[in-house]
Amino acid sequence: MLQIKQDLLDALGQALKTMAPDSGVAAVFESPKVAAHGDFASTAAMQLAKPLKLNPRQVAENLRGLLLQAPAFARWVDAIEIAGPGFLNIRLKPEAKQQVVREVLQGADQYGMQLADSPHRMVVEFVSANPTGPLHVGHGRQAALGDAICNLFDTQGWDVWREFYYNDAGVQIQTLATSTQARAKGLKPGDAGWPEPAYNGDYIADIANDFLAKKTVKSDDREFTASGDVEDIDAIRQFAVAYLRHEQDLDLRAFSVRFDNYYLESSLYSSGRVDSAVQKLKDAGKTYEQDGALWLKSTDYGDDKDRVMKKGDGSYTYFVPDVAYHLAKWERGFSKAINIQGMDHHGTIARVRAGLQAASAGIPQGYPDYVLHTMVRVVRHGEEVKISKRAGSYVTLRDLIEWTSADAVRFFLLSRKPDTEYVFDIDLALAKNNENPVYYVQYAHARICSILGTWAAQGGDASQLKSVDLSALDGPQAQALMLLLAKYPDMLSNAAAGLAPHDVAFYLRELAACYHSYYDAERILVDDEAIKLARLALVAATAQVLHNGLKVLGVSAPHKM
């Protein structure tokens, strides 16, 4: 059906050129807000009315006449109706919609994907938690968002690089070290001599005990053996960071999130990248000194005020390593960069982009892109859950996975726009009913697999479904299901362009609902062989698209439930 839609759009474009060669009106189809109005809709007639100085409905009549003469419309379109002030509502013939079943079954896991001969390179930075404690549910939302956005761009033919940026050079790391040292010396929160500020969770005691036991910890890219010397604060710091990096690796593994690279903030200093970035800005004439500090002329690039880069004591402000880091992204060949961060990072966007523009490195405006998300509240039995014994002051990602499942956490956290607050209801995530969105979608897939399994047990061969006669798929529920399957590729493309994985979750819920309606309307395993095979082909195609969409979200598509 993809080619059919393109042929119809080409015919519409040619008709628009015939009527108004210089109008600039694009050939675009929209989805009617009411399904009964048709399968595609066009507002082109209303857009042409002004340049043609004609009534929109008259333009629609003229445009309709041209379209009816086009071979593609004659072959695939059942009717073109004019509605309201000049809408063109297009109804497809059943055989046009039936084409999508073959496209899905032939494309299989590749259905909806765009292939590129020479894909552009992009980097998506997400999670990027300080190695100072277990990952909390906010990090979980970021992990789900980042991984799904990477998966979306994978489907669009991009060469996607997944990166975790470790903030291992800030004051929080020193707080981690002093907290661990205090635990190693036998102190507890509230004792005389307990440091302030400090991390108070039970995990600090675990780190201290392993440090005293001289254990070795290994994260994905390095390992460190404890010395056991409670006076060696640097050794304690290195061990604590390695320990928590390992713990975070375990959290992410439980969430099925992988990274291609772990980039250390400290490496920006040790490699000289921070000093180099500052020198670039100086050489470009985009800095000045005032009150003993070095300032960036960030107002030249849309920031609301100039920003201090280097304080009087010689230390850099926190956005300077961010500028250096993003210069490094560009220099590594990433033409597109996306950062998934909490809403509290909103204030850094303008100054980081200003620094990149001021560096005169050829970086386009708006680099990098940002997806900002709000935090997550967790409720159980109607009461908010705030405390985790392990973390001390927040619910961890691992808590949530253990209480529910990785699938539920993923789907739930992706089922709302990132900038809307989300309340994670543990009871709902555990429910086995239609109110639970992930259960509802997964059950649709499992239900189809059960039908196909029953047929296979009777001697059915799934490979023959790619070529069966589909003319029996002419009922309204079947037509609606096929039209929705046909929307999957455009939905994926639009979701990637809009950095909107929630659109995939919305689509899957709609597809599951459409399938359940079809299942209730028509028996699949009927006696008539031709009808049975056609219906089996349709439900097999539906299962394939459910599987593909769930894979984008990082959620499993079970065969049994």
From Swiss-Prot:
Keyword Aminoacyl-tRNA synthetase: yes
MF (Gene Ontology): arginine-tRNA ligase activity; ATP binding
Enzyme Commission number, as recorded: 6.1.1.19
Alphabetical list of InterPro entries matching this protein: aa-tRNA-synth_I_CS, Arg-tRNA-ligase, Arg-tRNA-synth_N, Arg-tRNA-synth_N_sf, ArgRS_core, DALR_anticod-bd, Rossmann-like_a/b/a_fold, tRNAsynth_Ia_anticodon-bd
Keywords attached to this entry: Aminoacyl-tRNA synthetase, ATP-binding, Cytoplasm, Ligase, Nucleotide-binding, Protein biosynthesis
Entry similarity comment: Belongs to the class-I aminoacyl-tRNA synthetase family.
SMART domains named in the record: Arg_tRNA_synt_N, DALR_1
Top EC class, one word: ligase
Biological process, per Gene Ontology: arginyl-tRNA aminoacylation
Subcellular location: Cytoplasm
Any Pfam family hit: tRNA-synt_1d
Record-level GO cellular component terms: cytoplasm
Assembly information from the UniProt record: Monomer.
Source taxon at top rank: Bacteria
HAMAP family associated with the record: Arg_tRNA_synth
'HIGH' region (motif): residue ranges: 129-139
This protein's name: Arginine--tRNA ligase
Catalytic activity: tRNA(Arg) + L-arginine + ATP = L-arginyl-tRNA(Arg) + AMP + diphosphate
